[in-house]
């Protein structure tokens, strides 16, 4: 199975890239974590932010491989603790499909992205910076994988 983190925004700070890559390399070949970045639309003072969000949403949806399970990351999604995320990861693996996790831009995800989602995941009720979300997702998924595989990384 492959877990694709599909995120709006490029040119992340070095610490974000290094942190994500550290977790990415820990995953085994049968549960790969990959990052695919979509360029953010330009935001000016007079920009129609709804239109910007729609354009970013269209780009996100076009980048999803056919047949993938789509999971959006959003404040209004379902909160999963580590054991629940581990259960979700196990279900995804048993399903046999690859998974795409969507992270929107500063305004969030378009209605089309939300409608395409099979699941909605909330990391927190807090508003989190998008670079930090990438790290939290990568670490949380690795922790869930380690729990499912009796790896000593996760401790209760």
From Swiss-Prot:
It comes from the Bacteria. Signal peptide: none annotated. Disulfide bonds: none annotated. S-adenosyl-L-methionine binds at residues 73, 104, 123-128. It catalyses: pseudouridine(1915) in 23S rRNA + S-adenosyl-L-methionine = N(3)-methylpseudouridine(1915) in 23S rRNA + S-adenosyl-L-homocysteine + H(+). Keywords: Cytoplasm, Methyltransferase, rRNA processing, S-adenosyl-L-methionine, Transferase. One of its GO terms (molecular function) is rRNA (pseudouridine-N3-)-methyltransferase activity. Its EC number is 2.1.1.177. Belongs to the RNA methyltransferase RlmH family. Specifically methylates the pseudouridine at position 1915 (m3Psi1915) in 23S rRNA. PANTHER family: METHYLTRANSFERASE, RIBOSOMAL RNA LARGE SUBUNIT METHYLTRANSFERASE H. This is Ribosomal RNA large subunit methyltransferase H. It comes from Idiomarina loihiensis (strain ATCC BAA-735 / DSM 15497 / L2-TR).
């Amino acid at each position: 199975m492959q877990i694709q983190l599909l995120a709006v925004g490029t040119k992340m700070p070095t610490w974000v890239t290094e942190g994500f890559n550290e977790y990415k390399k820990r995953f085994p070949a049968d549960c790969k974590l990959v990052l695919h970045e979509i360029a953010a639309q330009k935001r000016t003072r007079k920009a129609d932010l709804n239109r910007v969000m729609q354009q970013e949403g269209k780009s996100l949806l076009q980048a999803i491989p056919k047949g993938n399970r789509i999971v959006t990351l959003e404040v209004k999604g379902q909160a999963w603790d580590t054991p629940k995320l581990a259960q979700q990861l196990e279900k995804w693996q048993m399903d046999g499909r690859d998974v795409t996790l969507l992270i929107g831009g500063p305004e969030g995800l378009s209605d089309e992205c939300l409608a395409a989602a099979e699941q909605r995941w909330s990391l927190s009720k807090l508003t989190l910076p998008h670079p930090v979300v990438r790290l939290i997702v990568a670490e949380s998924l690795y922790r869930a994988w380690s729990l499912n595989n009796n790896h000593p990384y996760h401790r209760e």
